[in-house]
Amino acid sequence: MSVITPELLARFDVPGPRYTSYPTADRFDEAFGEADYVQALQQRQSGTLGKQPPLSLYVHIPFCESLCYYCACNKIITQHKERAAEYLRYLRKEVELHTRHLGRGQAVSQLHLGGGTPTFMSDEELRQLMALLREHFKFVPGGEYSVEVDPRTVDEQRLAVLAELGFNRLSFGVQDFDPAVQKVVHRIQPADQVFALVEASRRLGFESVNVDLIYGLPLQTPESFDRTLAQVNRLRPDRIALYAYAHLPERFKPQRRIHVEDLPAGAAKVAMLSRSLDALTEAGYVYIGMDHFALPDDALAVAKRQGRLHRNFQGYSTQADCDLIALGVSSIGRIGSTYSQNAKTMEAYVDLLDQGHLPVVRGLALTRDDLIRRSVIMALMCQGHLQYEAINLAWLVDFKTLFAQELTQLEAMQAQGLVQLSESGIQVTAMGWFFVRGVAMVFDRYVQADRNRSRFSKII
């Protein structure tokens, strides 16, 4: 494969968003609140915005029993299991408030339980949660119903409960199989344990198993990560998410326990990425884009081939243009042309629900310019190409005129082999996929106007 040169890194490996949304969550505003969110829900229910798009649900379970030092998620570290029961009571309040505006029986084609650690909940609490959701929503046959699993918190019996509850996709947080790396990031889980769980998942009939990996963690080397990849290839999950570790200790306190001198240098981190791409593609995985891989017959790979890939707050998805109802503390949702976020602290979340309010505290109503740029950015992030005429027809604009400045900026990337510009469109090259966040940033009006990007991780 092509080699990422130091010159490319120096020029294009800059801090930038991951574009799970556009505009990105850092652009949300407290001027957008509960009333705006309720209006969006009511417009969906009344059909005033046209045909209802499919509905996706995200439920955030923030609790973890122990702290992983690399973590940048919104979580609560606690050994007090009773907190889950109390949280479940507030999730019920939140769901019931949604039902006031949407009615019961909205069809759901996608559900994701994330965290935190969803399996912090007991089997009975998970049963109560799913009963609550089924009481208020209609889960359609053939949908994608997934849950994030910490291998340290489950056994085959617990996986059987998840299957019984209707989950058909599992995502295991592995990160790295190297014991020294696991120790230094405070997440020890033997490889044998993960292998046994994945084998059990297959016996239980789960349609898809995902494994999360992180490169750039302390004490990792290209050679040690090669060994982790070899084990992952033996494991043969249906999907692999390969994330770059973003060391931002000024934003995420747990990362302050990681010593900077233990982190791999930039060249080593790039070597891990390029060698991972080689190893996984040679093993038969399809490179979906940026940080995702899938076996050729997995729904994600099929969606990419058919041009149906989408990107949402959980990463790449087969569920294009869903409305997303987000439940739980800090959750981010999307209804129509709006984004909304719940209160980030448990105290604020609970207080708002106790007052009878939906816990939305910030968000954004997208402008026409936002919507056009979102369609451009998502085409580049998901398909790696776009045709000017498709944007022209969808939005009744002239792409080359509207984005003349952006096309000029892309010429520098074309000169370095990252994109190909033609009379009809833009194509991201094989090398350009490494820097696709940077390609998308060219069309991000907010980032272009804001030179202070230290809140973002670097692209590679």
Tell me what each language-model feature is.
Residues 431-460:
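Short, amphipathic alpha-helical interaction segments positioned at domain boundaries
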Residues 414-424:
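A short, conserved structural fragment
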Residues 59-75:
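Local cysteine-cluster metal-coordination motifs and their immediate loop/turn environment
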Residues 425-429:
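Minor-groove-contacting beta-hairpin "wing" of winged helix-turn-helix DNA-binding domains
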Residues 46-47, 54, 77-101, 106-400, ...:
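C-terminal scaffold of the Radical SAM
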Residues 398-414:
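Short amphipathic alpha-helical interaction segments
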Residues 1-55:
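Flexible, acidic/Gly-rich N-terminal and inter-domain linker regions that tether
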